[in-house]
C-alpha cells in the first residue's frame, strides 16, 4: 500500500474528485475468480465464511471432482478425435482429415489449459491478492490526477464481451442439430459403440455439448485473464506517469502553496486539447484535482523531504509494476508457447476447410466464428504484449514533464537509479523463445498461410491423380 503522503496526507480513501475519482475497488478480479471456478480451473477454492462446518469436506471435494470431470471430458474427446483422424488418414480426404485434426487440437489444448491453470491456481490467487493489496487507485496527490478505475472498467467489460463471444461461437455449433431438428451429434467423431442409439444418444450429446461449453470457457478465461492483467498494469503505468509529472505540484500542495498558486500550476500542466501533448497516457484520462478538498487537511513539511519522499513513492510504484509484469511473464510464458502453436495450426486448418470445404450455410457460419475468434485471440495476446513493451520504458519521459530541476539537489542519486531502471522493458514471451508482440502476430500468420499453401498443393495433386 502507498503511504499516507501519496494521498496528500489527508486520507488513504480520499477522492480527488467526487465524480471523476471513484472509490478504491477491493477486488479487481471478482468476475475472473467466478469464471475460474466455473470452468474447472480452481480445485481448492476458499470456502465462504457462511459455509457450514459439517459440509466443509464436501466443499473441498466437489471442486476437485468438477475439475477432474472437465479435464476428463476434454481429454477423452481429444482421444476420440485422434482415433477419427487416424481412421480418415488412409482415405486421403483432406477435408475430413483437417476437420478431425482441428477438433483434436482444440480439445487437447482445452485439456492442457484446464490442467495448466489448475496447477497454477494457488500462484495465480497469490498474484491477484498482491495486486488487490498494492495497486494505486489514483495518482500521487497533485494538481492533476488519473484514476485507475477506468482500466478496471475496461477489463471487466472486455471479459464479459469476450466470454460471451466464445460461448456463442461454441454453443451455436453444439446446438445446431437441435436447431435443424435432425438426429445427429454436433461433433462427428469415432465411438466404440453406437452413439446414436436410443440409450446412448442423449448422454453422448450432453457430454459433447458440455465439452463445447468448456472449450469456450477455457479459451475465454485464458484470453480475458491476460488482457485484464495487461490493462490493469497499463493503468498502473499511467498512474506512475501522472505521479511523476506532479512531483513538484505535490511538493507545493503539501508545502502550503495557496489555492490560487496551485490553480495556476494546474492550468500550466493541464493544457487544452489543442496544446496538450498527445499520447501521454495509454488508457487513462487526466483530470483537474479538486484543490479545495486536498488543501483542507494538508500538512506543511520541508519541501525537500516532501519531494524526495514523493519520488520514493513513485519508485515503489514502479518496482511494484515491474514485479507484477515479471510474474505475468512467469505465469503466461509456458501457456503462450502452446497457445502460439495451437493458433498457428488451427488458423491454417480453419482457413483450409473454409476455402476447400463444402458450402453449407451453417457450416460456413460456424467456421467463420471459429476463425474470427482464433485471429482475435492471437491479436489480443500480441497487441497487449506490444503495449506493455512499448509503454514500460516511458517512465523517464514522464519525469521530464514536471519541474524536477527545482529539487534536483535533493534527489541526485535516486533519480539516476530510477532513470536507469526506467529503461527496463517489460516483455511477455512464449516459452522464452519469442516475444509476444506484433512481430509475433505477423510470423504466426505467415507460418499459418505457409502450411495452408502446402495443404492446397496436396489437395491439387490428389485431384490431378484422381483425374
UniProtKB/Swiss-Prot annotation:
It is found in: Cell membrane. One of its GO terms (biological process) is signal transduction. The keyword S-adenosyl-L-methionine does not apply. Residues 82-98, 181-212, 308-334, 389-467 are extracellular. It is a multi-pass membrane protein. Its main location: membrane. Belongs to the insect chemoreceptor superfamily. Heteromeric odorant receptor channel (TC 1.A.69) family. Or2a subfamily. Interacts with Orco. Complexes exist early in the endomembrane system in olfactory sensory neurons (OSNs), coupling these complexes to the conserved ciliary trafficking pathway. This is Putative odorant receptor 85e. It comes from Drosophila melanogaster (Fruit fly). The lineage of its organism: Eukaryota, Metazoa, Ecdysozoa, Arthropoda, Hexapoda.
Amino acid at each position: 500500500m502507498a503511504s499516507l503522503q501519496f494521498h496528500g496526507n489527508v486520507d488513504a480513501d480520499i477522492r480527488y474528485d467526487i465524480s471523476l475519482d471513484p472509490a478504491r475497488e477491493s477486488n479487481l478480479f471478482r468476475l475472473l475468480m467466478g469464471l475460474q471456478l466455473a470452468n474447472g480451473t480452481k480445485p481448492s477454492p476458499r470456502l465462504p465464511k457462511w459455509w457450514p462446518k459439517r459440509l466443509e469436506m464436501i466443499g473441498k471435494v466437489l471442486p476437485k471432482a468438477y475439475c477432474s470431470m472437465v479435464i476428463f471430458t476434454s481429454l477423452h474427446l481429444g482421444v476420440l478425435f485422434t482415433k477419427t483422424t487416424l481412421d480418415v488418414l488412409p482415405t486421403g480426404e483432406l477435408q475430413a482429415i483437417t476437420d478431425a485434426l482441428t477438433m483434436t487440437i482444440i480439445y487437447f489444448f482445452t485439456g492442457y489449459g484446464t490442467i495448466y491453470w489448475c496447477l497454477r491456481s494457488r500462484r495465480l490467487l497469490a498474484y491477484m491478492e498482491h495486486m488487490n493489496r498494492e495497486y494505486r487507485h489514483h495518482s500521487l496527490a497533485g494538481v492533476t490526477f488519473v484514476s485507475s478505475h477506468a482500466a478496471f472498467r475496461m477489463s471487466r467489460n472486455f471479459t464479459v464481451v469476450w466470454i460471451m463471444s466464445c460461448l456463442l461461437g461454441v454453443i451455436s455449433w453444439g446446438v445446431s442439430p437441435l436447431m435443424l431438428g435432425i438426429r445427429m451429434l454436433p461433433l462427428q467423431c469415432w465411438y466404440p459403440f453406437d452413439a446414436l442409439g436410443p440409450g446412448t444418444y442423449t448422454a453422448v450429446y450432453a457430454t459433447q455439448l458440455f465439452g463445447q461449453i468448456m472449450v469456450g470457457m477455457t479459451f475465454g478465461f485464458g484470453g480475458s485473464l491476460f488482457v485484464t492483467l495487461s490493462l490493469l498494469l497499463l493503468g498502473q503505468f499511467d498512474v506512475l506517469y501522472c505521479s511523476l509529472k506532479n512531483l513538484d505540484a505535490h511538493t507545493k500542495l503539501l508545502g502550503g502553496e495557496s489555492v490560487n498558486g496551485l490553480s495556476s500550476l494546474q492550468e500550466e500542466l493541464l493544457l487544452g486539447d489543442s496544446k496538450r501533448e498527445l499520447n501521454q497516457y495509454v488508457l487513462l484520462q487526466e483530470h483537474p484535482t479538486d484543490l479545495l478538498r486536498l488543501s483542507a487537511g494538508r500538512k506543511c513539511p520541508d519541501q525537500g523531504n516532501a519531494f524526495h519522499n514523493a519520488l520514493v513513492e513513485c519508485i515503489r510504484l514502479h518496482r511494484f509494476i515491474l514485479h507484477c509484469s515479471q510474474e505475468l511473464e512467469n505465469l503466461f510464458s509456458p501457456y503462450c508457447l502452446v497457445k502460439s502453436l495451437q493458433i498457428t495450426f488451427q488458423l491454417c486448418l480453419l482457413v483450409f476447410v473454409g476455402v476447400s470445404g463444402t458450402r453449407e450455410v451453417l457450416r460456413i457460419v460456424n467456421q467463420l466464428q471459429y476463425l474470427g475468434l482464433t485471429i482475435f485471440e492471437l491479436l489480443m495476446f500480441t497487441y497487449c504484449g506490444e503495449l506493455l513493451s512499448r509503454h514500460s520504458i516511458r517512465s523517464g519521459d514522464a519525469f521530464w514533464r514536471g519541474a524536477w530541476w527545482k529539487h534536483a539537489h535533493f534527489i541526485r542519486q535516486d533519480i539516476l537509479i530510477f532513470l536507469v531502471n526506467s529503461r527496463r522493458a517489460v516483455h511477455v514471451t512464449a516459452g522464452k523463445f519469442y516475444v509476444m508482440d506484433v512481430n509475433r502476430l505477423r510470423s504466426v500468420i505467415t507460418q499459418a498461410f505457409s502450411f495452408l499453401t502446402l495443404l492446397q498443393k496436396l489437395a491439387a495433386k490428389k485431384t490431378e491423380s484422381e483425374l
